Amino acid sequence: MKVEEAMVFLLAEKNGGMKAEQLAAAINSRRLHIRKDGLPVSVKQVWWCVNNFPDTFTYAEGRIFLMI
């Protein structure tokens, strides 16, 4: 599963939004995305998705929310 797909999955479960650090930790702990180099998903990757998928994610009140 791609990082953005994992983020949608997690945010759909949690209706109140999540911080980038929480999203990265949840993706890694549940092994929803495995990087090719074996490193854990970083907060930077989560922010990349938020910034590059504005129709899907929004940032408000210190949390990332689903737009869909």
Predicted regions and their residues:
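Charged low-complexity interaction tracts in eukaryotic proteins
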Residues: 1-4, 18-21, 27-68
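Hydrophobic residues on short alpha-helical segments
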Residues: 4-11
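Short helix-capping/hinge SLiMs at alpha-helix to coil transitions
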Residues: 12-16
